């Protein structure tokens, strides 16, 4: 995986001691069996609905051949066109959907301690695959192939159907935005928060 080469911003994860703090946090909350965490490659992906999405290859310096993996770090943006942002809500949705037929990554840990990376973030497993950019999809080979394009459409509709089967009332961030009814408590009383920092449960 190539490293990101864009000019880093002031609060970029690659600047200062942000990576060192993140490495310590990953060891404590995601990879507790490791002696330490060392980054071997990292790149910020495009898209992400304004959230920062980083692919990170990590290894244990004490046993790099046996202990290495790739994780995804999603961090809240400073600002964006669809505020407010809440990456911890996103993690709750992922958790709720994980047992359904909707393909989502497994949440490994969450953190809203701003002393780690400056903003709340979550860590998920890496799922191999390709997410076509809707802005350029018509130029992709699979789009020009009628059979493959039909397959993409069927896959999309299949996932959409699985999403429709999910009971939205069990997805806390979604249920919390619905207007309270006579037989349902208000969003404020229904809403609960995960621990400040820690592994997924």
Functional labels for PLM-detected ranges:
Residues 43-200:
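ATP-binding pocket architecture of kinase catalytic cores
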Residues 2-39:
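Juxta-kinase regulatory segment immediately upstream of eukaryotic protein kinase catalytic domains
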């Amino acid at each position: 995986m190539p490293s990101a080469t864009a000019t880093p911003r002031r609060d970029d994860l690659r600047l200062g001691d942000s990576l060192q703090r993140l490495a310590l946090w990953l060891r404590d909350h995601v990879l507790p069996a490791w002696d330490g965490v060392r980054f071997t490659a990292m790149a910020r992906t495009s898209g992400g609905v304004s959230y920062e999405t980083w692919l990170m290859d990590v290894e244990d310096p004490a046993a790099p051949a046996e202990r290495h993996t790739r994780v995804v770090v999603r961090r809240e943006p400073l600002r964006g066109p669809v505020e407010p942002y809440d990456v911890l809500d996103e993690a709750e949705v992922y958790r709720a959907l994980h047992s359904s037929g909707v393909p989502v990554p497994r949440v490994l840990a969450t953190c809203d301690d701003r002393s780690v990376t400056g903003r709340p973030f979550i860590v998920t497993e890496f799922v191999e695959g390709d997410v076509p950019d809707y802005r350029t999809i018509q130029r992709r080979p699979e789009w020009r192939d009628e059979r493959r394009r039909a397959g993409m459409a069927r896959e999309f509709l299949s996932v959409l159907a699985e999403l429709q089967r999910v009971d939205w009332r069990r997805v806390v961030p979604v249920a919390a935005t619905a207007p309270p009814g006579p037989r349902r408590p208000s969003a404020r009383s229904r809403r609960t928060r995960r621990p400040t920092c820690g592994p997924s449960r």
